[in-house]
């Protein structure tokens, strides 16, 4: 894959364009200036209070601006993570009391999804029941597990703050399985960025799951100041911006990062409607261990967000993703990777949006999938069996989490096999969709890979005659992980150009190309087809760009021949004569 091409696209092109991010929070100063032209909807979800104003402490305006503020009032100085994304805002603050209320998570997520938002971020949570799986956690898992059924829906990434109660635990609904739960790390001053924000809520959940999932900048974060707020304070402020700390600030940073990941998937490599679990997997894939190597842990989860590491890792390192597979009870799905250079790192992340658990149960995992990695010599590594931040052999399978990770510092040369197993299927749905993200040396990356479908060539007349116009077709399928636009496909017959066509293919798509042909000579005609004949496109493999086949051509009609080319009549009065003729069927057809 052309790393420079992707890097340029990432640096200059990713800004959240085309993404709608929903924010559920206190209220919004929609006239601030940093949201101009990008408000896809602003609504109140507070019972009895139709106002969407941000009148108390400006929390919602600050959060929304961290996701996608344009930086207009600061000449770009305090720009959000995804400054060209659109905002769908749901105001939750009761103006009289300043408390947050809503009609429920189901209602909030449904209205946001129906408005076109595919990312929903929430910098709020319960002030009790820390670590517990609440009815709100159930609701979040219900919506996300439904929408990640890719054959019917478009997927949604939902994020919740871990809360600021430190060792008391993670605030529900951040305890939901399928959401991305975000803790905070230091943003500025001593220890940043590799130390935790002191008050960030720690895991695990009551049923033992790893939370938070990731961490993002959580202290001294400068963002928009609501002009309507009566008690906007913070540790610094000017007319248009102020500084707040907390996992409320970290979560929108992760949401903005999610918007960039989703933009990359949909616009750069052409993967439409990615599962929310794939966005989660890619953020975890690139997450960096902070301080001593000890992931996963109850402070940072799988590490701090690093988008470059998620999407364009250094060197000859590729990324492979799949969010279009599903599994049912007892099944095993395998992926193989040919690692051609020893001594390089390898990381695989499996995520799935699990069927909702129950607030009355002590066990929340319903569909238990397992991740395994098998080395060329047969050594097996299990998901989430870690020591000192890296996977080790042995250990027991994880039957608690719906995120499983394997990470190695060094791999041997040869074929490595990833296995996804459905070891226990407890939900009511037959199929469990999942997402997998892999990073490693010579791993199939996010490039397209158009190739010819075996045995797909067809001639409208199986054995055409000379001069007969027929239709010649061949099928091409994109077996890669990225889309390709207007890649040329050339056809030749007996080394002469038959024609060239352009084809565009999304991942997994198949197209049939058709050429008209009228053979000029009988006998064997050699057909050759070439994808990208001038080698101008980045592909996972160039070795499958050629296809050839022989077509037999017959001469038309019946041929008449004789031993004597002419017959001479000597008796002009004779009324009859004899001439031996031979008739030959030259069409190879009866």
Residue ranges and their predicted role:
Residues 33-35, 39-40, 145, 185-193, ...:
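Catalytic-core environment of secreted peptidases
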Residues 443-566, 570-590:
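Extracellular/luminal regions of secreted and cell-surface proteins that mediate adhesion/ECM remodeling
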